[in-house]
From Swiss-Prot:
The active site is at K21 (proton acceptor), T24 (nucleophile), E74 (proton donor). Keywords: Hydrolase. This is N(4)-acetylcytidine amidohydrolase. PANTHER family: UCP029143 FAMILY PROTEIN (PTHR38088:SF2). SMART domains: ASCH.
Length: 105
């Protein structure tokens, strides 16, 4: 079933709105989006809407395949990115990279 909204931790809001964060790494359950799809974006903590995004690409990627390029697209260093993934998805190897662009704020 396609997602009809997407949430991010509040700590990522500024990076998304500034354009510094252009991808999100999700597990399979949160990977059900299609190229061109438009989604409202809210904070995970309070479900407060803060922008809409359009999906540009969805690509499977393994945790061990993450590079500095992925980290830069997340506006983090590679060690920071791996730590965040381990915190959110402990023990998960298969991820999905969802590339997006902001449509409105």
């Amino acid at each position: 079933m396609l997602l009809n909204k997407i949430t991010f931790f509040e700590r990522f809001e500024h990076d998304i709105l500034s354009g510094a964060k252009t991808i999100t790494l999700r597990d399979e359950a949160e990977s059900h989006v299609i190229v061109g799809q438009i989604l409202p974006v809210s904070t995970f903590e309070t479900e407060r809407w803060f922008c809409d995004i359009q999906i540009i690409d969805v690509t499977p990627v393994k945790l061990t395949e993450l590079t500095e390029v992925h980290a830069k697209q997340e506006n983090m260093t590679l060690p920071q990115l791996r730590d965040v993934i381990a915190e959110i998805y402990p023990g998960l190897e298969q991820l999905f990279m969802i590339r997006f662009r902001i449509l409105s704020q």
